[in-house]
Amino acid sequence: APIVSGGYDF
């Protein structure tokens, strides 16, 4: 999954 703004990746 892409790393979103915030720095988490589910």
Curated annotation (Swiss-Prot):
Broad class of where this protein is predominantly found: cytoplasm
Residue ranges the record marks as coiled coil: none
EC category name: hydrolase
Location relative to the cell: Cytoplasm
EC numbers for this chain: 3.1.1.1
Catalyzed reactions per annotation: a carboxylic ester + H2O = an alcohol + a carboxylate + H(+)
A GO term, aspect molecular function: carboxylesterase activity
GO annotation, cellular component aspect: cytoplasm
Alphabetical keyword list: Cytoplasm, Hydrolase, Serine esterase
Family that this chain belongs to: Belongs to the type-B carboxylesterase/lipase family.
Protein name per its UniProtKB record: Esterase 52 kDa subunit
UniProt lineage: Eukaryota, Metazoa, Ecdysozoa, Arthropoda, Hexapoda
